Amino acid sequence: MEPIRVIESRTVVLPRENVDTDQIIPARFLKVTDKKGLGKALFSDWRYAADGAPRPDFVMNRPEAQGCSILVAGDNFGCGSSREHAPWALVDAGVRAVISTRIADIFRNNALKNGLVPVVLDAASHAKLLAAPGASVRVDVEAQTVTLPDGSTAQFPLDGFARYCLLNGVDELGFLLAQEADIAAFEGGRR
């Protein structure tokens, strides 16, 4: 994982509520264990017609969505089953942060382990983002703030360990491996 301190990008707004992990990436794409290429399957049933042609009316297929790395989603994003492929697909598609008023716990944990910043904002701040598709927004992981289109900032919660991992570009296993010498010394002292 790459360290993430600040993400500055225009936003893509997907105002649908209760987007579950099967809508993020349908089950037929879960047969792989390689993260690369899963971005093509992101929101597949919404992005593509039955013949595989892109649907021009879907927000992520529009030209103005290209290069955006912040997704503003409706309430209760990532609900449903535990599907690590969902954050894999988002990250592979270039999404670095998802902003909502509520993000499902399992999705949130999987996102953090894969370098995707789950941002939960208060309803008023979130409404400002929903009303301004394509606006430039800044997500500051270190300060735990989002700079909104009007220049105001909103705080978002992030536990200390998750914040440490994002800022240092490590997952839980990477963190433990970095402590190997200390763990060995502790174990050696117990014998």
Curated annotation (Swiss-Prot):
HAMAP family: LeuD_type1
Reaction catalysis annotation: (2R,3S)-3-isopropylmalate = (2S)-2-isopropylmalate
GO cellular component term, pick one: 3-isopropylmalate dehydratase complex
Keyword Transcription: no
Origin species: Anaeromyxobacter dehalogenans (strain 2CP-1 / ATCC BAA-258)
Keyword Amino-acid biosynthesis: yes
Protein name (Swiss-Prot/TrEMBL): 3-isopropylmalate dehydratase small subunit
NCBIfam families with a match to the protein in the record: leuD (TIGR00171), PRK01641.1 (NF002458)
GO molecular-function term, one example from the UniProt record: 3-isopropylmalate dehydratase activity
InterPro entries cross-referenced by the UniProt entry: 3-IsopropMal_deHydase_ssu, Aconitase/3IPM_dehydase_swvl, AconitaseA/IPMdHydase_ssu_swvl, IPMI_Swivel, LeuD
Pathway: Amino-acid biosynthesis; L-leucine biosynthesis; L-leucine from 3-methyl-2-oxobutanoate: step 2/4
An annotated GO BP: L-leucine biosynthetic process
Entry EC number(s): 4.2.1.33
Family to which the UniProt record says this protein belongs: Belongs to the LeuD family. LeuD type 1 subfamily.
Binding partners and assembly: Heterodimer of LeuC and LeuD.
Name of one Pfam family that matches: Aconitase_C
UniProt keyword list: Amino-acid biosynthesis, Branched-chain amino acid biosynthesis, Leucine biosynthesis, Lyase
Functional summary from the UniProt entry: Catalyzes the isomerization between 2-isopropylmalate and 3-isopropylmalate, via the formation of 2-isopropylmaleate.
Encoding gene per record: leuD
